[in-house]
UniProtKB/Swiss-Prot annotation:
Lineage, opening ranks: Eukaryota, Metazoa, Chordata, Craniata, Vertebrata
Biased composition (Basic and acidic residues): 412-422
Pfam families membership: Exo_endo_phos
Binding site for Mg(2+): 49
Annotated site residues (Important for substrate recognition) in this chain: 180
UniProt protein name: Sphingomyelin phosphodiesterase 2
InterPro entries: Endo/exonu/phosph_ase_sf, Endo/exonuclease/phosphatase, Sph/SMPD2-like
Reactions it catalyzes: a sphingomyelin + H2O = phosphocholine + an N-acylsphing-4-enine + H(+); 1-O-octadecyl-sn-glycero-3-phosphocholine + H2O = 1-O-octadecyl-sn-glycerol + phosphocholine + H(+); an N-(acyl)-sphingosylphosphocholine + H2O = an N-acyl-sphingoid base + phosphocholine + H(+); 1-hexadecanoyl-sn-glycero-3-phosphocholine + H2O = 1-hexadecanoyl-sn-glycerol + phosphocholine + H(+)
Class of this enzyme: hydrolase
Job of this protein: Catalyzes the hydrolysis of sphingomyelin to form ceramide and phosphocholine. Ceramide mediates numerous cellular functions, such as apoptosis and growth arrest, and is capable of regulating these 2 cellular events independently. Also hydrolyzes sphingosylphosphocholine. Hydrolyze 1-acyl-2-lyso-sn-glycero-3-phosphocholine (lyso-PC) and 1-O-alkyl-2-lyso-sn-glycero-3-phosphocholine (lyso-platelet-activating factor).
Length: 422
């Protein structure tokens, strides 16, 4: 690769709010989105909440000349809602479904039925290997009483691990999506500290868009004040994150958001605002010690995030075990009731009552058993994430105590990882 190598990458990201039968003005919004993407001709368009495969096929056909490669990530019952459109050939595609996706009995929230996931596409651009990830994490339905907090932390860790272990051959890593987390939330900090990804909004040289980069704003006609909760001026939960390995330099030249309306038509594309980033990748000769200046501070931030995540996952484990125990007792009670009904049915006096109560009792046992098994699985999944975090925390703390150099967010570690692959 030439030393004067330079690559400009234009990226588009949007949570499309494309829910069949529920989302307003779907057909019109999809048509205008397709027109806009054709007009702008981005290198990559990464979309979330496209829960109608028919709408994906419509966009794929409409964008086929501008974006010849496209992929729809299928998972769960409803689907992940993730899809990508690329001007460049997609070399590889991988999908990973998160282990924890909410609760099946919270059917009115729907996250469990979607099978929230992360999609990876590998592109080769002028000799450079780009790993682009698109994801959508579990929604936050209540800031004050967030029953899914542990699930979202576990998803953030799973996402960070997936990126860490699949990006070792990549020169540039790009993550776009709706993380459903504010910039300073634990999951967001954990993700950025472990992967070394940088926030385009923080790093950009030129920003134009909604105040504070918010991606849900009150002036959007599809957003209600209830959606914003205690943040009346808007929230920033959609992101463009990126990094480059040693030997390359990446920066965000411009970042734009829509501001509650379509730039050309006036009405919004979605209840979320779109993100449009222009990234510049250049060849950069490796420095002698590119990370030593900030290594200690970054390790301290990582250790802090890992400790907090371990604590929150511990709370989630305790809660899951409590629910499993409760429904285990209910299941035992139901089985005891069935035994009693069998005894009563053997006699003449209470046979009709026993027969009448038999079906509800069987339903109680089956329902309680299903919920018991789900929470047992939830507890084990949270324990697995906590054990992984504890292992990384132990290793990182030992490294800090020995005064050794960087954790995986630093470039020298990534060089070592890449060397091992060769």
């Amino acid at each position: 690769m030439k030393h004067n190598f330079s690559l400009r990458l234009r990226v588009f990201n949007l949570n499309c709010w494309d829910i069949p039968y529920l989302s307003k003005h779907r057909a019109d919004r999809m048509k205008r989105l397709g027109d806009f993407l054709n007009l702008e001709s981005f290198d990559l368009a990464l979309l979330e909440e496209v829960w109608s495969e028919q709408d994906f096929q419509y966009l794929k056909q409409k964008l086929s000349l501008t974006y010849p490669d496209a992929h729809y990530f299928r998972s769960g019952i409803i689907g992940s809602g993730l899809c990508v459109f690329s001007r460049h050939p997609i070399q590889e595609i991988v999908q990973h479904v998160y282990t924890l996706n909410g609760y099946p009995y919270k059917f009115y929230h729907g996250d469990w039925f979607c099978g929230k996931a992360v999609g990876l596409l590998v592109l080769h651009l002028s000799g450079l290997v780009l790993n682009a990830y698109v994801t959508h994490l579990h929604a936050e339905y209540s800031r004050q009483k967030d029953i899914y907090f542990a699930h979202r932390v576990a998803q953030a860790w799973e996402l960070a691990q997936f990126i860490h272990h699949t990006s070792k051959k990549a020169n540039v890593v790009l993550l776009c999506g709706d993380l459903n987390m504010h910039p300073k939330d634990l999951g967001c900090c954990l993700l950025k500290e472990w992967t070394g990804l940088r926030d385009a909004f923080v790093e950009t040289e030129d920003f134009k868009g909604s105040e504070d980069g918010c991606t849900m704003v009150p002036k959007n006609c599809y957003v209600s004040q209830q959606d914003l909760g205690p943040f009346p001026f808007g929230v920033r939960i959609d992101y463009v994150l990126y990094k480059a390995v040693s030997g390359f330099h990446i920066c965000c030249k411009t970042l734009k958001t829509t501001t509650g309306c379509d730039p050309h038509n006036g009405t919004p594309f979605s209840d979320h605002e779109a993100l449009m980033a222009t990234l510049c990748v250049k060849h950069s000769p490796p420095q002698e010690d590119p990370c030593s200046a900030h290594g200690s501070a970054e390790r301290s931030a990582l250790i802090s995030a890992l400790r907090e995540a371990r604590t929150e996952l511990g709370r989630g484990i305790a809660q899951a075990r409590w629910w499993a125990a409760l429904f285990g007792y209910v299941m035992i009670l139901g089985l005891s009731l069935l035994v009693l009904l069998c005894v009563l049915a053997a006699g003449e006096e209470a046979r009709e009552v026993a027969i009448m109560l038999w079906t509800p009792s069987v339903g109680l046992v089956l329902g309680a058993g299903a919920v018991y098994l789900f929470h047992k699985q939830e507890a084990k999944s949270l324990c697995r994430a906590q054990a992984e975090i504890q292992h990384v925390l132990t290793r990182t703390t030992e490294t800090q105590d020995l005064g050794s150099e960087p954790h995986p967010t630093h470039c020298r570690q990534q060089e070592a990882d890449r060397a091992e692959e060769k």
